[in-house]
Every structure is written in C-alpha cells, then in structure tokens.
Amino acid sequence: MKTVVILAGLVALALSSAVPPPKYQHHYKTSPVDAIFVEKQKKVFSLFKNVNQLDYEAEYYKIGKDYDVEANIDNYSNKKVVEDFLLLYRTGFMPKGFEFSIFYERMREEAIALFELFYYAKDFETFYKTASFARVHVNEGMFLYAYYIAVIQRMDTNGLVLPAPYEVYPQYFTNMEVLFKVDRIKMQDGFLNKDLAAYYGMYHENDNYVFYANYSNSLSYPNEEERIAYFYEDIGLNSYYYYFHMHLPFWWNSEKYGPFKERRGEIYYYFYQQLIARYYLERLTNGLGEIPEFSWYSPVKTGYYPMLYGSYYPFAQRPNYYDIHNDKNYEQIRFLDMFEMTFLQYLQKGHFKAFDKEINFHDVKAVNFVGNYWQANADLYNEEVTKLYQRSYEINARHVLGAAPKPFNKYSFIPSALDFYQTSLRDPVFYQLYDRIINYINEFKQYLQPYNQNDLHFVGVKISDVKVDKLATYFEYYDFDVSNSVFVSKKDIKNFPYGYKVRQPRLNHKPFSVSIGVKSDVAVDAVFKIFLGPKYDSNGFPIPLAKNWNKFYELDWFVHKVMPGQNHIVRQSSDFLFFKEDSLPMSEIYKLLDEGKIPSDMSNSSDTLPQRLMLPRGTKDGYPFQLFVFVYPYQAVPKEMEPFKSIVPDSKPFGYPFDRPVHPEYFKQPNMHFEDVHVYHEGEQFPYKFNVPFYVPQKVEV
C-alpha cells in the first residue's frame, strides 16, 4: 500500500460538496405581521448594519446627525433622565473606537444613562430618533449594548426581532485566525488563488465568500478542555448568555423599570444552576470528570488563550497555574474572600438584617435575597446605595480570573474573555466560578425543609409508563454571516457585492419523542416536567439522588388535562418549552419581512437555548443518563404575573422539585418516574475532524 498525502484544504473541499443546506431554509416557524410592524422592524434593523462605521446616505445618519436631545426634552416621560444624560455627555462620553464593557464603572454609568434615554422616549418615533443620534455620536459598543436592552424592554418594540449577536459582533464569536482570512479577501478585492484558497479552507460560493472554521485547539486550551471547545465556543450558547443579561441586567432596578422583584434572585440562581448542570453533562460524556475547584490563595490550574481581539488589543491570556494572588489583586482577593465568609456567617446566624431588610434563611422565599446578594444587583440595596457595583463579587472575580492588567484609564483596558457576556462562556474558569457561587447558594438551601411525601404526592394520578425514542447527537455544518467585521468603502456600503460567511460544524440532535402513560382517577389539569440527569459520576459509580439533586437539567414543562382512566401523552422534542429554533440571518429575515412575516422564536423566545443543545454530545456506544418525569397539580400564576407566564409558568419554585435538597425515599411515588436512557453519537466524535487544520496534512492509505 502506498500513502498519499492529501492537503486538508482538499479534504475540506470534498466535504463541502456534501454539506446539506442550512436548515433555516426549511420549515422555520413564522408569524404574520402588519405593515406598521414591518416598517418598525426595518428601522430597528437599519441601526445594526455595519456598526463600526457610518453610512452618510442612510436615514438614521440624516436624522441623528443634527438631532437635539435637549430641544426635544418634552418628548421624554422622565425629564431628569434627559438632564442626567446631557450632564454626562457634555463632560465627555466614551470615544468611538474603544472597547466597551459593562464591568467597568464609568462605561457602565454612561451606558445606563444612554439606556434610560432610550427607555423613557414617549413614542417609537422619538426612540428611533434618539437611537439614530446615539448611532452617529456614541461609542459603537455602548450604543449596541443600550440599544439591545431598550428594544427588548420597551413596550412599543415588544415582539420586534433582534439580529443574532454573532452577526452584530463577529469578533466576539470567531477566532482571529478566521477573521484575518476574511480581511485578507476583502483587501484583495476577492482575488483568490483557488489552490491556495482551498488549502486554507476559503471558497467563493454564489455571492458569498465562505471560510471553514475549526474550534480552538490546545493553543487556546492548554489542557484537556479542548475536548469540549465545540461547547465553549458555540455561537448559540454564547448568544443565549448574552440575551439573559439583556433581559435582566445586574444593574436593573425592579422598582424603577419593571417586574420580577419578588423572584429576581431566584431567577439568577435557577439560570446559573441550570447552565452549570448542562455543562456538567457535557463534561461527563467527554471524559473530563467533575468541575474543577479553585482557591483565591492558590494558582488557578486552568489556563486559557482566547485567540480573540478587541478594537486595538488582543484578549488577555491566562496560563495554566496562573498565580492570582499577586500584588495587583491583593485588595480584590481580600474582598472576595470576605464576601464568601460574610455569607457563611449570615447562614450561621440564620438571618440577615441590613439595608432595611430582614431575612430568615429558613424561609423558602429567602432565595430571592440570596440570589440578589451574590449578583449584588440593584434590588439588594436601598435606593441610596444602588450603584455599589464595584463591591460586586461577580465583577471583582471576573477581573481577577480574567488575568488582564489593570486598566490604563476609565476607557482603556486590555480585554479578557470574562469582560463580555458574549465571550464569557468560552473560558473554562467561568464555569468554575459560577459552580463555586452555586455551591455557596446550595449551603443556604440546606436550611430549607425538604419536601415530604404529602408535598410531592398527586392523589389519584399515577405514571404507568414512560418510553423514550433513541437519543442521538451529531455534528452538522452551519453558516453564519460575519460581514459586520469588515470595513467597506463609501461606494460599497449601500450595496456591497459580497457577503462573508463562516462555516462551522455544530452540535445537534435527532428529533425524539417522550411517551408518557398516565392512569388517573380524576379529571384535572396537571403539570408535566421532564428532567435529564447523570446516573453515574465521572468514576463510573452510581450517584445517590441526595448528592445529585442539583445536577438535573430541566428539559420541558407543559400543562395537560388528564381524564379518568388511562391517558397516553406524546411530547415531541421540538415542542419542549425551554428551547427555541436557531436564529435566522438578517438577510433571511428581510425576505420574510417582504412577505409580511417574522421568525416566531426570534420574536418571542430570544432568551432561550437553541434546541440543538438540548442533549449533551453522546458516545458511540451510548452514554447512560436518567430521565425524570414528574406530574403534579397545576396552580396558575397570580393575575399580576400572567403577562410573564413564559418566564414564571406556575406558582412553584423554579426547578421544582429539585429546587432544594431531597429525601430520595419520597421520590419513588406513583406520580414520578425515573427512566434509564442512553445518548448516542453518530458520525465524527470530534468536530475538528470535519475541518482538518490546514497545517496538518492527512495521510490516507490507498
């Protein structure tokens, strides 16, 4: 046999011919909209195009260039907000071209002032004019941050579609190696040597240049963490985290802006507990074991080299065994340690009393205070001290673990992955930090009375059977547009002839259904919950439920009316509540708008996880998990919370019945069922085998 060395680019070329069309071209759920909605939507979209430069012929520029905020002060419902903004703006706002991060004090102060200016505009026209003014005159990153939140939070923009963050900020979702290739093609005006281009995974397809992209390797993850780089760097997962912040920023004051004050801290805990549980499942199937722990007084073992760049500087790098306890961090380390110890002292006392609050830690509602404490959000303090975010545990921890030097001034800093919600999930130490926070909150959970048999029992209702289709994951190619990363000429900005797309394999799963047999003695509205949890730990030993309760990941919640006798309920994975379809590209949304339609999930469920990440990547022989199905009586939310049923679906705690430590003997009741399942993986186990790096020739036996 002779060995033929085949260039990886040619392998990629062969693979590209077998790539199925992106699935967004088929069967995407849409909703009809009227002409007024379409006009609003197109105006909102126009401000996202080529965000790093201005179009002097665009409508927004003509409006924003000369718009006078002060002269229009009567068009804002809160005049003090306008005055506060103008005071900051005239003393000097953040210049254009600088990197923006909400985790730095002066930038945060300006961004909140800008958001409030957007938020208190009396009508959509004033909002659009104000946003146009900011698009022209304000720092690009700050504008986008405030604009995203305002579109989500304003009543007159409710339901409008926002572009996927990875289209707006490609530099935060794509390694610099790929964007360098994009810039090269742009600078060469599309000139391509076909042989050389194939070698580097670059192709011209129709009106687009397509760039094959791997996930980061051991250069970025100098440890075994590269095994799940496809998870860390998934553009849908990172967008999900960004949207979570957009819907409920840590600086958000519920008294001032809106709802959820009574459950805000609970939402914080539930979000991170579920994110860590989902991450843990991915670690198990990849043989990475338990989530590592760290100490503020010892080197951090897990290094990370982001391979990302900001406006002027590359992202900071953290080597393995990074010594965080150094002279630039002493003060922050002391604060972080004191913050943790103070919380444990509160728990030992059993109560907290300060900031006009008195909390009993034996009360289940205390979770709201505990979540607020760890987020250090605006609802924790009274009105006089709501801006004490510099005393935030999260912000200080991100700065210490990010390993960046101290900022040069209020606007100049070396960015780290932990400085942005769009990039935080790429850094493995992020999960170690939030696992640490969740473990502290679980210390509080130990003070809660576990559910007893009567709490969990459903009189007259029994789950007789649960059947689950084969669970199988696979990797598939997906294209996403990175055209916003390039600068274009004045001539081309109106109608640039080409688009730039990155093609990358992403984790997905085959559709499946869960069939539930229920025998009932009564006719009643019942809630069904489906969870996925580990059955064995990283060493292969069964995990007792008493130690495993907070590792169950909630897949679905739905209400079904059961009738006397035998009931057969089939739930399709595509209908699971906590997931959505992937975002459509802006180019596809424009086509839908011309037909009077919008993508339903992008309009209604932007803050949920993509369906394709529902299951952890399986293994060839099937990785064992357990599916938990639970049915209980439905209790509607209070009337005042009905508009928010998508977030607060019923009156039970988030994650119920796994919202507190459990007594396993009470989880063997007729209205509960544990079903052993296996998650298989079909095709290549590791996505980098789809796109072999160009610098590694492949040997093929002939």
Swiss-Prot record:
Keyword field: Glycoprotein, Secreted, Signal, Storage protein
Main location: secreted
Record: glycosylation sites: N75, N214
Tissues of expression: Fat body.
Stored Pfam families: Hemocyanin_C, Hemocyanin_M, Hemocyanin_N
Signal sequence region: 1-16
Location in the cell: Secreted, Extracellular space
Cross-referenced InterPro entries: Di-copper_centre_dom_sf (IPR008922), Hemocyanin/hexamerin (IPR013788), Hemocyanin/hexamerin_mid_dom (IPR000896), Hemocyanin_C (IPR005203), Hemocyanin_C_sf (IPR037020), Hemocyanin_N (IPR005204), Hemocyanin_N_sf (IPR036697), Ig_E-set (IPR014756)
Cellular compartments per GO CC: extracellular region
Disulfide bond residue pairs: none
Superkingdom of this protein's organism: Eukaryota
Molecular-function annotations in GO: nutrient reservoir activity
UniProt-listed PANTHER family: FAT-BODY PROTEIN 1-RELATED, LARVAL STORAGE PROTEIN/PHENOLOXIDASE
Chain's role: Arylphorin is a larval storage protein (LSP) which may serve as a storage protein used primarily as a source of aromatic amino acids for protein synthesis during metamorphosis. It is a constituent of the sclerotizing system of the cuticle, and serves as a carrier for ecdysteroid hormone.
Family: Belongs to the hemocyanin family.
Quaternary organization: Arylphorin is a hexamer of subunits alpha and beta.
Protein's name in the database: Arylphorin subunit alpha
